[in-house]
Amino acid sequence: MTEPSAARDAYTHEERAQAGRADGHAHDQPARREPAPRGPWGALVEAVRCPVCGDSLAVAERSLRCPNRHTFDIARQGYVSLLSGAKRTANADSAAMVLARTAFLEAGHYAPLTGALARTTAALGLPAEGAGGTVLDAGAGTGHYLAAVLEALPGAVGLALDASPHALRRAARAHPRAGAASWDVWRPFPVRDGCADIVLNVFAPRNGAEFRRVLGPRGALLVVTPTGRHLRELRGALGLLEVDPDKAERLERTLSGHFAPERTEDLEYPLELSAADVANLAAMGPAARHVEPEELRERAAALGERVQATASFGISVYRPLPPAG
């Protein structure tokens, strides 16, 4: 299938200037009834729960509000701020990392992965015929992969969870049927039990217990991880983090007791990258937190104008185990 592009709108001057500011917060105010806004939240709100008290949420003006009047603003960029204050995570992607990732993905270098993920999703036969269905993307980043999955599931809606407000600005616009909310995926998710038909996890932390809780009994978990061969030609020169050789074993341990593996598809193909592509690749990942941007650019430039590398991924499907007892 044709790969859906990530949201292509660039940050405004104001967004760049205020990249570190988190939009929205939880607060108490009198309840007001307002019609639900157009967009995905009218469909998604049934799945979401108040992160303060666990009660249901409803759309109220430009916010989500529970019966106890805990209120969560829908930022002007379209995402909902469920994390606030000290609960925000320190390792969320920066504005610069998000811009680099967007540029790299829009160049099409991971299009084979995006297409394979969409085909795998379509082959699952979920949701049941006649049902709209819900896809939860845990650690969604810019929503690039969620958009592809939603294209493969006409009528389904998607919820992108991520800790980075900069990424969420993109995720909220990645697809007309996608909503986005700020959240730390290591914490219990602010969604009800069994609400998801598919849980998507692409290059993101894995919370096996929460994946199982929010996934319906006939649902599926899709996990994408890099293999040890991924970008092997660039790791030393750019200072990229090595892929743990025991990553597959650790993945199985993380999901053990919650999921049974169904199948894994290996996807490997050559990459031809420009110096700008290599710079974006280095700047969009964890290395950007440890190496100065100028040094990353110098390392990328030293590799030459055209660079050959290997893209190598595992796409795994898991099914939820029945409850114990």
Language-model segments: residues:
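N-terminal auxiliary segments of SAM/dcSAM-dependent transferases
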Residues: T2-E14, H25-N91
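Conserved Class I S-adenosyl-L-methionine
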Residues: V45-E46, E265-G325
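Class I SAM-dependent methyltransferase Rossmann-like catalytic core
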Residues: A90-A116
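Class I SAM-dependent methyltransferase SAM/SAH-binding core
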Residues: T134-D137, G141-P188
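A short acidic, Gly/Pro-enriched loop at the edge of an enzyme's catalytic core
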Residues: R187-I198
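A short glycine-rich, Lys/Arg-flanked "PGG" loop and its adjoining helix->strand segment in the class I
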Residues: G208-L222
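Conserved class I S-adenosyl-L-methionine
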Residues: A220-E252
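Short alpha-helix
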Residues: D244-H258, G285-L296
